[in-house]
């Protein structure tokens, strides 16, 4: 079997090799790792990389989906099938406090909804199962606070991120040593761009949620975003009437807090062509990123992904 030398690897092959190295490093050095699964395109790439990294064995860690109960229906439909097909054990956690209080983005706003369902839900799940390392699909090109976060991001005993108290990462040398009670958030695709992700999905034929492709969907224009009416829980404001538009999503989250973009890109080559021409970040469609100045960094300091 021939092996490509590093000098002959393509750009995507180099990224793939780096990500697989990170996955194996954590599996070897940490006692109880887990892979966070948000059902989005970045998670799909991470699952595929993990399956490759440990083939023909099953990946030596489970998947964890922190469920808010407000994801798009198409995301839930894909979740169980993909995890089963790739041989992962899937754990689903819902914050019992948020569930009991009926926390939702309409009555309680995006900030409280995100804090209880996502941040507190994640911290509960990590503590419940005793995970000491969690893989996440964040990338540096997404948002400024993620741009300065290390690949191996250390969290305190309270699961908080202190950007001023992180380990240096020299070349490809990663330090996994933790103080008692500390944990790691690890980002294997930190150095990938949105375009890299799409090209890799196309090259490897990775299954993704159909919402990433343009189709006629019912949306309302709200606060500068096109919000899809995904089920009968959606509350229309006075004067709002859903309109059918050709839209797709560049990022996926809770559907009342995720804006679509008008598009006709219905295939992977068309999406890639669109990415070559775009000048905006994919996270412009996330309502939670616009709560307040530097809100993503504050969320991460409180324990967010």
From Swiss-Prot:
Region Disordered, residue ranges: 283-305
An example Gene Ontology molecular-function term: ATP binding
Pathways involved: Sulfur metabolism; hydrogen sulfide biosynthesis; sulfite from sulfate: step 1/3
EC number: 2.7.7.4
GO biological process: hydrogen sulfide biosynthetic process; sulfate assimilation
Keywords per UniProt: ATP-binding, Nucleotide-binding, Nucleotidyltransferase, Transferase
Reactions performed catalytically: sulfate + ATP + H(+) = adenosine 5'-phosphosulfate + diphosphate
Subunit structure: Heterodimer composed of CysD, the smaller subunit, and CysN.
Name by which UniProt lists this protein: Sulfate adenylyltransferase subunit 2
Source taxonomy: Bacteria, Pseudomonadati, Pseudomonadota, Alphaproteobacteria, Caulobacterales
């Amino acid at each position: 079997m021939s092996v490509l030398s590093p000098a002959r690897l393509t750009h995507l092959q180099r990224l793939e090799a780096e990500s697989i190295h990170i996955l194996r490093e954590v599996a070897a050095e940490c006692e109880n790792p887990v892979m966070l699964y948000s059902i989005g395109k970045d998670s799909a790439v991470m699952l595929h990389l993990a399956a490759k990294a440990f083939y023909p064995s099953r990946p030596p860690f489970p998947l964890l989906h922190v469920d808010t109960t407000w994801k798009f229906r198409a995301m839930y439909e894909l979740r169980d099938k993909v995890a089963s097909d790739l041989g992962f054990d899937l754990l689903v956690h819902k914050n019992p406090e948020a569930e009991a209080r009926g926390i939702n983005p309409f009555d309680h706003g995006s900030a409280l909804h995100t804090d209880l369902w996502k941040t507190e839900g994640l911290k509960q799940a990590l503590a419940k199962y005793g995970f000491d390392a969690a893989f996440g699909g964040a990338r540096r090109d997404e948002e400024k606070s993620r741009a300065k976060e290390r690949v191996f991001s250390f969290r305190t005993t309270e699961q908080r991120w202190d950007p001023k108290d992180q380990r240096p990462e020299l070349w490809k040398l990663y330090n996994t040593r933790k103080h008692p009670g500390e944990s790691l958030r690890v980002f294997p695709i930190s150095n990938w761009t949105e375009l890299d992700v799409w090209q890799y999905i196309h090259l490897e034929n990775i299954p993704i949620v159909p919402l990433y492709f343009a189709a006629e969907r019912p949306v309302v224009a709200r606060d500068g975003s096109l919000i899809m009416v995904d089920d009968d829980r959606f509350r229309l404001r006075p004067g709002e009437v859903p309109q059918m538009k050709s839209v797709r999503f560049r990022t996926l989250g809770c559907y009342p807090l995720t804006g679509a973009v008008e598009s006709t890109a219905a295939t992977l080559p068309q999406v890639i062509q669109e990415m070559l021409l775009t000048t905006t970040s994919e996270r412009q469609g996330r309502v939670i990123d616009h709560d307040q100045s530097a809100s993503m960094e504050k969320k991460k300091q409180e324990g967010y992904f």
